[in-house]
Curated annotation (Swiss-Prot):
Annotated function: Participates actively in the response to hyperosmotic and heat shock by preventing the aggregation of stress-denatured proteins and by disaggregating proteins, also in an autonomous, DnaK-independent fashion. Unfolded proteins bind initially to DnaJ; upon interaction with the DnaJ-bound protein, DnaK hydrolyzes its bound ATP, resulting in the formation of a stable complex. GrpE releases ADP from DnaK; ATP binding to DnaK triggers the release of the substrate protein, thus completing the reaction cycle.
NCBIfam families (alphabetical): DnaJ_bact, PRK10767.1
Assembly behavior: Homodimer.
Gene behind the chain: dnaJ
Disulfide bonds: none
GO biological process, one term: response to heat
Keyword Ligase: no
Lineage: Bacteria, Pseudomonadati, Pseudomonadota, Gammaproteobacteria, Lysobacterales
Protein name stated in the entry: Chaperone protein DnaJ
């Protein structure tokens, strides 16, 4: 039986471009694929015909030989680089189904890489605010030095006969085909006959890796620093993973952080609160002063602009908020106690209301409450 013209099989003109040939082959292969036509001998024959036509026309040398001599180019040892043997169906159908489901085709072991590694870096607030360079040590998998990651003692590897070097095999599920890691070579695509004595064929060994990390100024808890290629070494010489360093800032004895702002409490004496005063407060950049006006109450906030944290993103500076707390005196001397008693004696009648309005309001509220309860 004479063969059909390859261009006719694919439904393209003789001057068709490589892209037109590929699209035509996709249509033909999808239409006649055995998975879509189970038990249909005619469809299976048409599928093989499409495959053979594309294998010839997609190869520049074979196409030129075919254009010059037709099917005779591949008979009786004539030129053209050998007869049609079939394209890599994994690549073709990776393209087809990748386009359908939104993914791209993956070449042999293209998706394999080393695992990413996580590390928690604890910093003091001062270190996080100023930035720091820190050396860390992480246990991870690194490339085996004696075999350079190949896993082979003599550097020789063989292509896996099961997956033909792809690292994946196709599994049929009804009319659908799935890909999974090749069980024969464990997804490597190669087989090692003489395993490396150091890594036992794995191509990787466990090691404590020492790295120097530059932490930028202004980082906060939860920020992550990515170090590309510093994760686990990839299997069989594939690319390494990444290292993700997560920052965790320790609690501070004085300051509490809220984004780029800092908060602290400033205790003051009763006399300072009543009469007013100037007090010195700590900041991350040194000391500063805040002026306490007379009659200041507990909870009043004083804002020191630019005394917070310089943002790691915008480089603007946050503020420092100082909350004053009026401290009740303790361990009083006899003289101090007597003075306070004399002072308290002045709070009588309307003077008490005038000098302690909140206390008077509270007492009035309590009295009104009990009056309503007992009436």
């Amino acid at each position: 039986m004479s063969k059909r013209d390859y261009y006719e099989v694919l439904g393209v003109a003789r001057g068709a471009s490589d892209e037109e040939l590929k699209k035509a082959y996709r249509r033909c292969a999808m239409k006649h694929h055995p998975d879509r036509n189970p038990g249909d001998a005619a469809a299976e024959a048409a599928f093989k015909e499409c495959k053979e036509a594309y294998e010839v026309l997609s190869d520049g040398n074979k196409r030129r030989a075919y254009d010059a001599h037709g099917h005779a180019a591949f008979e009786h040892g004539m030129g053209g680089g050998g007869g049609p043997g079939g394209p890599d169906m994994g690549d073709i159908f990776g393209d087809i189904f990748g386009n359908i489901f939104g993914g791209g085709a993956a070449g042999p072991r293209a998706a394999r890489r080393g695992a990413d590694v996580g590390y928690v870096l604890e910093l003091d607030l001062e270190e996080a605010v100023a930035g720091i360079e820190r050396r860390i040590e992480i246990p991870t998998l690194v490339e085996c030095a004696p075999c350079h990651g190949s896993g082979s003692e003599d550097g020789k590897v063989e292509t896996c006969g099961t997956c033909h070097g792809r690292g994946q095999v196709r599994i049929q599920r009804g009319i659908f085909a799935m890909q999974q890691s090749c069980p024969h070579c464990d997804g490597r695509g190669t087989l090692i006959q003489n395993p490396c004595k150091t890594c036992h064929g794995a191509g990787r060994v466990e090691e404590d890796k020492v790295l120097s990390i530059k932490v930028p100024a202004g980082v906060d808890t939860g920020d992550r620093i990515r170090l590309a290629g510093e994760g686990e070494a990839g299997p069989a010489g594939t690319p390494p993973g990444d290292l993700y360093v997560e920052v965790r800032v320790r609690e501070h004895a004085i300051f509490q952080r809220d984004g780029d702002d800092l908060h602290c409490e400033v205790p003051i004496r009763i006399s300072q609160a009543a009469l007013g005063d100037t007090v010195r407060v700590a900041t991350l950049g040194g000391e500063a002063e805040i002026r306490i006006p007379a009659e200041t109450q507990t909870g009043k906030l004083f804002r020191l602009r630019g005394k917070g944290v310089r943002s790691v993103r915008s480089r603007s500076e946050g503020d420092l908020y100082c909350r004053v707390v009026v401290e009740t005196p303790v361990n009083l001397t006899a003289d101090q106690r007597e003075l306070l008693q004399q002072f308290e004696a002045t709070f009588t009648g309307e003077d008490a209301r005038k000098h302690s309005p909140k206390s008077a309001t509270f007492i009035d509220g309590v009295k009104g409450f009990w009056d309503r309860m007992t009436s």
